[in-house]
Amino acid sequence: MVTIRLARGGAKKRPFYNIVVADSRNARDGRFIERVGFFNPMARGQEETLRLDLDRVEHWVTNGAGTSERVAKLIKDARKAAA
C-alpha cells in the first residue's frame, strides 16, 4: 500500500522530517516515490515549520494513498493555514 508519511532527517537531537509518498513495505528513511513537503518541529524565529504541496497530497489521496496519523494532522493544519 502507498502511504504518505514522515522520513526523518536532520542531526542528532535536531529532527527534520521530509513528508514523502512511499510504499509501506520500504524502510522509514528508505526509498520513496515523491517528496511532497517537509516538517521542521525545531523551527526557530522566522524559520518555516511546515511546507506541503497540497495539490500533490490531494492527488495521492484520491488515488488511494493512506496517511500516517501525524501526517493527517499536518495536512489538516496546512489546509487551515492555506484558507
UniProtKB/Swiss-Prot annotation:
One GO MF term on file is: structural constituent of ribosome
Cellular component GO terms, alphabetically? Answer: cytoplasm; small ribosomal subunit
- Keywords for this protein: Ribonucleoprotein, Ribosomal protein
Domain of life per record: Bacteria
For whether the record's keyword set contains Cell division, the answer is no
Could you provide one GO biological process annotation from this protein's UniProt record?
translation
Q: What InterPro entries does its record include?
A: Ribosomal_bS16, Ribosomal_bS16_CS, Ribosomal_bS16_dom_sf
Database matches in PROSITE patterns: RIBOSOMAL_S16
Database matches in NCBIfam families: S16
Family according to the record: Belongs to the bacterial ribosomal protein bS16 family.
Q: What is this protein called?
A: Small ribosomal subunit protein bS16
